[in-house]
């Protein structure tokens, strides 16, 4: 409870700071990222109506804030208070304690064989491996998978 209160307080303060900032700089070559906020064990921050976190996601989006919410339970992102997955620009999936069929289907827009393939890939992920949504080939009409499997040695 104390840790939750501290994170809640910090998120509220970040909201105050980011509301005052101008929009992030964007041009053809780059997008300015001012700050990363990483919340590990994020399920503790997603299981209640966390207005400061929802505001931070909304405000931070065009102010150069990148928020990483990490949890081993993907169901946490489908909170009854807020759909965090719908607001995720780059959802990354690492090894999970349990795999939610509905979240995989919603996130990747797959059914049947493609769904079973992604689910199997997630179940087989090893330390340092992740799956990222990547429908580039499909959008170009070239077929291909709706995801990429990546080996990560350093996140930041």
Show where each model-derived region lies:
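Conserved P-loop NTPase motor cores
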Residues: 1-117
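Conserved P-loop NTPase motor module
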Residues: 5, 121-156
């Amino acid at each position: 409870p104390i840790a939750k209160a501290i994170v809640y307080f910090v998120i509220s303060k970040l909201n105050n700071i980011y509301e005052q900032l101008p929009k992030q700089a964007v041009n053809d070559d780059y997008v300015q990222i001012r700050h990363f906020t990483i919340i590990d064990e994020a399920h503790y921050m997603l299981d209640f109506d966390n207005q400061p976190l929802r505001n931070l996601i909304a405000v931070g989006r065009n102010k150069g804030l990148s928020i990483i919410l990490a949890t081993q339970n993907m169901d946490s992102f489908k909170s009854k208070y807020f759909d965090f997955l719908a607001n995720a620009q780059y959802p990354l999936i690492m090894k999970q304690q349990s795999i939610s069929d509905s979240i995989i289907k919603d996130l990747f827009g797959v059914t049947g064989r493609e769904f079973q393939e992604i689910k199997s890939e997630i179940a087989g992920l090893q330390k340092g491996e992740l799956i990222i949504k990547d429908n580039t080939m499909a959008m170009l009409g070239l077929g291909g998978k709706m995801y990429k499997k990546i080996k990560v040695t350093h996140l930041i």
